[in-house]
Structures are given as C-alpha cells and as structure tokens.
C-alpha cells in the first residue's frame, strides 16, 4: 500500500497539477481521481494516464506540474483508501497526468489486486491529497481486466464533466476493453487518448482504439491538439506509467497479467512494429539508439539478446501486450521502444539536463511529458516512496530504491526544480524507466515505485521485466521491479541501461537507486559485454565467408615471386613455362588427373585383363565406384558378365593357365572371392573361353569390353546405347552364333576331337575340348586346387562373363543381354555351353548347339513363348541328347571333370570334391559330383544340354557330377549352365541353372531360356510360366531388380530388392515391364549368380570361412534366381515371392520332376500338395522319426538341433556322414533341427549342427545330384560353418531341395514375415546386412561369375533351382531318396540358414516360422532355408533366411503379423501334424495370410507341399 500511497501522492500531485494548470480543485480532485483511475488504468494499461496527461499537460504548464509533484510529495503516504477514494477526483486530466506518472508508480502497486478496493474506496480520500489518485490504480483493480469498470465507478464519482468525459470515455473504453485493453485502449481513450492513442493505437496497436477511447482521444485532441506533443510525451509517459500500472495491475495477478501481457506483446508485436515504423516517434525511437535500447529492453526481458532485442523485445512485448490489451501492450511496446529512446535520450538528457527522450517524446508530448514527468516524478517519487515500502517486500533493490527513491521522490517532488528536472528526467525516466525498467538509474524512486509495485507482485517484477522488454508502460514501476530485472534486462538494455542509468542516477540524484542502478550496472555491464558479444556474429560471419573462399582442396598455387622490376614482360615460351610452373592451368591438373586415372585404370585393367575382360568392362564391374553407382549396377552386372565372358574367352584364347592366374589374381584382388573366383573364372575362361573368345569371345568380349569401358566412364550414355549395342552385338552374335552354331553343331556332330578343334578354331570355345577345359580346369584346379571351388566360381563369373561376352552383354538392358545371350546362345552361349560341352563332349556341344538354335530364337525373342517352346524342344533335344551326351560327356567330362576333380581333390584334399570341389572343396566326395557339374554346364551351355546332363547326372550322379563340375566351370563362364549343372545333378541343376541363370540367363539371355526350356522339357507349363514369367516384364523385371538389387550397392540392394520384391509381390509380374527387367535382370542375375556363385565358390573353396560369405552370396544368387524363378515360375508367387517363380523354374529345372513340374504348374496345387506331402513324407520317412523328433527338438531346444544334426548327419554334426542317404536324412533332420533350433533362437550356436544339417541337406542334395551335395555336406560338417557349408551345398547341392525349400521358404518366410513383426525387423536388419554382403559379392561379380559357375552355379541353382528343384523333387518325380535327400539337405540348409536368420533375428520362432512354418518343416524349411540361404544367406548371416527384400517389404503389410500368428499356429500344427497337415495348414495359412494372391494356388501348390515337407523335416529334425 505504500506504493499505492505513493501513487496516491502522485495522483494528488497530479490533482494539484490540474489545479495549478487552472483546473478546479474539484477538477483536480477529479483529475486525481482520474489519475487514480488512470493510475489504476495505467496499472492495467499504460496508455490511460497518458490521455489524462495529454489533457492535463496542455492545461497546465510544466512548471505547474512540479508543484503538483510537490503536492504528491506531501501526499506520498496516503492510505490505500485514500488512493482508492482519490481516483474519483483524479478523473480530471491533471489527475490523469499525475496518474500517468502515478500509474507508472502505481504499476508497482497492487492496483489490479485492489480492483474492488478501488471501487470500494471513495475517491474523496484521494481527492484532497491526490493520493487517492494513486489508489486510482487500485480503482482499475475493480475489474483487473477492465479499467472501464474502475473508470465507470470513477466516472460516476467524477464530478468534473470534462475530465469525467475523458475518464468516462476511458471507462467506456475500459468497459469495452480487457485489462490489457484498458491499459492501452482505455488509457488511450483518456484525455491523451486522441493523439497518443491514435498514435500508439494506430501505430503500435495497428488498430484504432475503442470508439470511446477514440472519442476521448478526439475530445482531448480538440482542446489539446497543440499540446499533442507534450500530450504525446505525457501520453508516452502515461504509456510507460500505464504499462507500469498495467503491469502493476496485472502484477496484482502477476502471473495472469504477465502472461496475458506477454501474449499481448506477441500479438501486438507486429502491430507495434508497424506502429513504430508508422509513428514518427516510433521512427525516431527506432531510428535512434532507442531502437537498440528498446530492442535490448524487450530482448532483455525476452531473450536478453542485443541483436534480437528489438525484435525479440517487440515480440515479448507484443505477446504480453496482446495478452493484456493490444493497445496497451502495443503502447507498452512502443514505450519499450520509447523507453529505449527515452532511456537513451533521458540518459543523454540526464547528462544534458534536457530530455532527449523528451525531445523524442516531445515530438508528440515533450512539454507535457516534461510537466507530467515532473509531476509524475513527484507522484511517482511519493508513490515510489510508498511503493518502495510495498515493493521492498519483493526485492532488495526495491527496498534499496524505496529508501533512496522515497527521499529522492520526496525531495524531487518537493523541489520544483528537482521535480522539473525529475520531470525532464521523468519523461526520460519514464522513457528510461521503460527502458530502464530494469534500470533504476534515472528515477530511482520511480524505478523503485515500479520496482516496488512490481515487487508487490513478483510476477509483476517478472512481468515488469518482460514489460520493460515488452513494453515501456511498465517502465517506472517496472523500473523499480526491473532494477533487478534490469540486470537481466540489461542484456537487452545493455548499453542504454548503463548509460541511462548512469545519467539518470546522476541527474535524478537517486543515490540509493544509483546503488541499485549500480547493481543494475554491474549486471548491465556484463550484459553490455553480452551485447558486444552479440555484435561479434558479423565477425563470425566474416570468418565463415572467408573460410568459404580459403580455397579448394586441390587449389594448390605455388606462390612465386615475380620480378617487380620487370615493367614489361615478354611472354616468351620460357616465361610462359615459368608462369605455367608458377600457376599451372586447369589443363595441367586435368592431365594429372587423367594420368592418375590412367594409372588407376591401368592397375584396374590388369585385373580386367587377368580375367581377359576388357579393362573398362572388368573395371566397371569391379570398380567400387561402379558398384556404388546404382544406375550402373545393371551395367555392372552386364559388364561383369561381359567381362567374365570376355575374360573367359580371353583366358581361353590366351591360355588357361595365364588367364586362370590373371583371373584368379584379378578376382583375388578385385573380389571378395579372391583367388577362388579367379581360378574358377580363369578355368572356365580358359576352358570355355579360350577358343570361344578366340572366335566370338574376343570379338564380343572386346566389343562388350569396349562398350563396358565406355559404360564405365560413360555409363549413362552407354546405357542408352547399350540396347543398340546389344542389338548390334546380338545381330553380330546371332550371325556369328548361327555361323558358329552350325560349326558348333557340326563340331559336336563331329567327334569330340574334331569338334573341339573346330570349336577351338571357331568361335565356339564352349566346343573347345572338354579336355581342354578339363586341362584348364585341372590346371586351374592344380593351381587353385584348394580354390577349385574358387576356380569353379571364377569360371562361374567367367561363365557369366563369357555368357556376357558370348551374349555380348552390352551395357544395354536385360533384353539386350537376353538377345545377346540368344545370339551368343547360338554363338557364344553355345561356345560357353560348348565349352561346357567341350568338356562334356562335342555331342553335347552339338546338342547344346541344337538347344541354342531354339534358344537363340527364344532368347532373341527375349524369352518369348515360342522361344520357350523352342527352348523346351531344345532342352528336350538336349535332354534326349543328354543321355547320349551324358554318356559321352560324363565319360569324357566326367573323366575330365574327374581329372579336374582328382587334381582338385588332391589340391583340396577332399575325397570326391573334384567335381563338387568347385562347390565345396572340403567335401570332395560329394563335391566331386558337384564339380562334375561342369559337364552338365556343357549341357547347360545349351539349356537342353544342361538338362540332358542333368538327366545324365540324375541317371548317373557321379558322371553328371563330373559334367556338373564342368558345368560349374563352364557356368563359370556361363553362369547359368554351371549353376544349372551344379545346382541339381538332376533337372534341378538345370532348373537351378535356369533359375540361377534365369537372371543369368536373362543376363546371357540364351541360358535363361535354355534353362527354362530345359526345365520346361518335363513341364512345358512350368517352363512356359517360368519362361514367360522370365520373359514377362514381371519376371524379367523382378529378376533384374532382384538380381540387380543384390548386385547393386547395399542401398541398391535394399532399395531395389526391398522395393522390387514388394512391387513384384504386390503387382503382378505382368505389370513389370520387360525393358526394366532386361537392364536389371541380366546383369543382376548373372552378376548376382556370378557373385553368388563366385562367393559360394570362394566359400566352398575355403569352406568354413568362405562358405559363410559364399552362402551369403549364394543365397543372394538364390534369392535373385529364386526371385527370377518366382517371376518365371509363379507370377503370383513371384508377386509374393520372386522365388516362387524360381520354384516353378526349379520344378522345370528338375528333369526328373519336370512332369510333376508341369503338373505343378498346371495342377500345381494338387500335385504340389500331393508331391510335397509325399515328398515330405518321403523326406520324413528317411528320417521321419528323426525329423519328427527333431521337430520337437527344434521347438524345444537347440540341443536337439545338434542331436538332430548328429542324428540327421551321422552323430557328429561336424562330421558329415559319408553315407549319402544317411547324410541326406541327417542333413534333412539336422537342417530341420538346426533350422528349428535356430528358429527357436538358438541361432548360430547350432551353426555346426546347422552346418551338419546343411551338410546333410547338401549331401542329400548332392547324393540326389549324384553325390556332389554329400561332399558339400561333409565339408560343411567338417569345417564349413554348418550354415555356410549347407548354404554352399544347399546352393549347389540343393538344386532340387533348395528350390523346393526356397519355394517354401519364400512362402513360409513371407508369411512368417507377415506373421512375425520381429522377424520383419530382424529380416530388415539381416536383410540389410545381407544386402551389404550381397553388395560385396556384387562388387566382385566378375570373378564371382566363374565361381558362380564353378560352384555358385550350384548355389545359384539352389537359389533358383533349390526352390524349384526341391519343389519338383519333393512334388515331382524326383526319386524319393533324392527328394528326401534334397529336401532333407535343403531343409537342413534351409534351417541352417533360417537358423542363422533366427539367430540374427534372435527369434527362433521367427526363424522357425520364417518359411511360414508349414508343418512341412523339412520342405518348408528347405524352401525357406534355400530361399533364405539364397537370398537371405547374405541376410542370413544377419539372421534373415527369408527373402530379405520381401521381408523388408512384406513386413510392411499387416499380413506378416497375421502370418506370424498363423505361423505360430502353423508351427504348432506343423509340429503336431508334421507332414501333410502341417503342409496343408501352412498352405492354408499362407493363403489365409494372403501371401499368395493370384498364383498362390499355383505357387502354394508347390510351396505348401514343400512347406509341408519342410515342416515335416523341421519336425523330424
């Protein structure tokens, strides 16, 4: 109440001022009342006192104001009642003036907290002393939000009509306005309202005041137009005071008021800025240091940031202002601006004794302000004296200032001069106060008052602080409050505050306030520093700018001193050279860069040359940048194929040994696979490519290499050209191929030697002696005996490269690759196959040639249906010939392969790994069979030939294995044939080759059609589906995307694979456009299979270590192949799972199962279910008890997984049973158990059991394939991580099983993916990791293709053929033992991979459910594992055996969760039903999960059966 009393004193002083100004005592009393009311209003709204001041100021000279100031000095201690009563009389303008000053002081008072009190208290008390006028602030309190309430009551009491009108107008305005509005609007509505309100309202508020206020403003303006400058000054003072009052009033409810005021400030911010910009005063204020002060003031409260002070303070002010009243807050804001100006000016004025701010204010209200300020100073001093007392409670400064301010106020008001000085100061001070709200310097008492008033309400102090920043209205009271606040506000006020405070303190002689100001100064000084610091950013910016131009990385400039004495320079050559040395031109660095690049290229070129690729082509494939280029991925794949093929051809031409060395070196250097791939690649290159490249190989290889070279640096342009160049090469190769084809055919028709000679002489290096290839293989095996799988893998890449060369895989799209493959199929492809055939025999070559004749048309048709039928016929012919060819070829090739295998075996030190050694070095027995794939690859060379070889291999596994091995190596050159061959000794191998090659076939277009045709021999429907799907945009695109995605960078793999599988899944394959597929599929497929095979081979070579990577790559290849196959085989499945298509292809690939495959395609559901059930039963029956028990074990524990692995594999999981059936059973069981246990979450701990399982599965597959898988399984159990060994074996040995398993895995995994969100996440993670691995593999596809061919063919075949072969073997007519073995091995592999996936996922359940967990645990897991091992083998390491992309995508659909649930149920059912029921349940649930949409029946026809079997195996395991 002391503050209120001070306000009352100020009000009474104002009342006397009114009298002095010639206004009646009553008027003065009324004015006092008005002052009170205004003080109250000011407490709520800074503007109100100003209107009164405007009127009063004109009425009485400044000189009178000091007297009233003295009078308030006398009335300094009025009681709150007096204050309350006084407002009735202070309704007069003089009172208002006093109040405006008072309200500044009263602002510190609890005017708002005393609203009722104000109304209750008679104004009469205030009337005589004018102290009541200060309590007029309290009168505002009746309606804290509306001064109008107070003004109304005051107006009712107001005897002075003139003032009463003004006050009444204010009251009306107040009624209209909220407290905030009252503060600004109502006060503006006061006598000062017209000018100040209009000015502030229009400028600050950006909107007119209330009509009542406008009317009052007009009324006051009419009599006081001349006084507008003083009035404005007083108005601004009032604004300041009002802000103080408003703050005070608001401070009564400081939280509300301040928040409201702050909100108002933010709201009025823009308006205030507009007004300030519009207002002359505001312009001056803003233009001057005041702007900074204001900025700093407002910023002080808000951010305390000098740079942002203006804006921030303005924002803060407006936030508060609009909360309170837009007008009030805007006025406050303007006063914040003004206070900055005023504060700055008063500080200056303090020094000069003139109100510089008054000058600024005087623009509108300098005289009035001076008078009012003097008066107000008195009133404020008195008020502050009281407010000080009141405020002392809140703040030390307040106390300090109160003590000093009271005497200062009392003294100042008492002495007219001092009052006048203070008056001058006061406007300044108010201005300063507003700005110095934190400053107590100018008017310590006033600051005290505001501080005290604010002190009463600590929120007020906070509010005042904000107000100081936000608005100047809180200047006086806020000053008191901001005395401390000012320290904080000093940030904003910084400079102004210090200077103002110093000046104000000196001028006002507010010693205690000076002390408080010193405190402020102390704080302010640091804030000044802060402000100075804020000005540093330009320096920072400068440095930033400078840093920008510090120079480029390579902008090395040799600074040389130029002879300044040389006024003229002769630009002679010597001088130019000198200057050139001083500052070499861009050309110099360009040359350097070119040289550097040339060196790099030369370094890279040897790698390419090592594989006999064109440096550019090979370079592009191997260059990490090329890999990193997603857009170049397809090209890289194509390049890889081309380079591999060229390398194969070149190697073959040059010398198998040297090329082999180069290839292996290059592969070792360039690829993950390293030497193994190189060896494999070189071997096929030498064997297949020597003459082939001599004839077609060199031409196509060179052309392709050139294209690829172009493509490397100009890949985009070349990509555009690639179709043309591919077509051109295709035409060439078609012609050459046709020419060579007859030669090749004639050569094969001729005896092998002549045929070989012809082939060697001609462009059909494929027809080159199988002995030659065997020699090379042997040489390479001898050289890389340990790396024989690598040799196979290298050959695989070379096979792909040769296929690319033969099918000059121009950087063009997949179609051109297909076309080139078609041409090369007839020409180079035959040569490749012929190389395989060469190893196999000339008859096989002839068969291959025959196959290629249809194949060429088929591939020329880009896998057209007629081509497909041709391929079928060709495959049939080849198959028919295959028997002969198999007999011939197995004899020769087997011998050659066996020699090779023997050497390899010696090298690898595995019993029968020679043939399969390409696939797995560790287990030579079964691997020997796998290695015999190479002859199969000859048949693979002609898809029919591969089929025949497969038939032969099926018939005689060992011999076919030899052929298979040759096929491996030949596939090294022709990724597909080898894959076909090695994938399944039976048709599975071919189907695998088809599937694996399907991408590769797509790459080397003839192979895919050939493979498809080969597969389609037995099942035209499947082949048509596969072929059509393969040829169809869906299949092609899917293959290309799936294949390319893995080959692309990890991002590409993830992006393309993730998006493509889902895209293919969700969009029918037909929706995919073949053009996309051509560009992606050939390269990705081939590269992927090459990479995968190469990786597999590398892993197989170093089975334990490499196998993991190999398996990953293998799985990737399988995934790609399977996806391609899924496209080919099942559009729906491909849609769901690209591997479904591969399943069909696998079915097609399985020659033995081809009838079933055809049946599968047509009555796929029935036959698949039946076959799957029977197969799963068969698989289960071989180790049914083990499978069932292992199923329990799987679920129960991983312990049983090892047991089951031992069971399935022979008891030692690490020791692969040599007995193929037992191994197969064990592999199956182990795979199931391992997969199951891995699914259980045992992860890789059962890796060796999984390894055993994988080995067993692989062995089973190998046995089925003629024993190549068994050695693989053995090596897996021996040293290969079970999963990886199985992955390798599963891929090569898996062909049937892997296809089936992949099919089931696709479905099951997809469903499981839907079923298990965690599995999805795990799949995503593992998929990404696998993608990266696959990317790594895809980074080295050049040598990988060889490996791919050597062993990866098996892997890739397991990718494609695993699903289909397994499906076909399970469903189709594959021998039960083979089926069982394949399924078992596949299941083991699948489970291993799934187990790995489960481990990675740390979700055994997910792993178990990965395949969709059909009760066909064996088949489902085989399918799934094969699939996962293939596609997710890379991801499998991460723990995702399922289709990474699908998982990544399919997890998007809720169906995966459903599938997870279903899968869980299925698992239970599976365990319960184990076989048919499980398979049926899985099938049903898979359908239920809408996994297979359109082709679900077809795909599930195969897949559910496999799932059933897989599930059975899982359970059995």
UniProtKB/Swiss-Prot annotation:
Signal peptide: none annotated. The keyword Transcription applies. Its main location: nucleus. Residues 644-663, 764-773 have a biased composition (Polar residues). Keywords: Cytoplasm, Developmental protein, Neurogenesis, Nucleus, Transcription, Transcription regulation. Pfam families: DUF4683. The keyword Nucleotide-binding does not apply. Residues 381-405 have a biased composition (Basic and acidic residues). Residues 678-687 have a biased composition (Low complexity). One of its GO terms (cellular component) is nucleus. GO terms for biological process: negative regulation of cell adhesion mediated by integrin; negative regulation of cell-cell adhesion mediated by cadherin; negative regulation of cell-matrix adhesion; negative regulation of neuron migration; nervous system development. This is Neurite extension and migration factor. The gene is Nexmif.
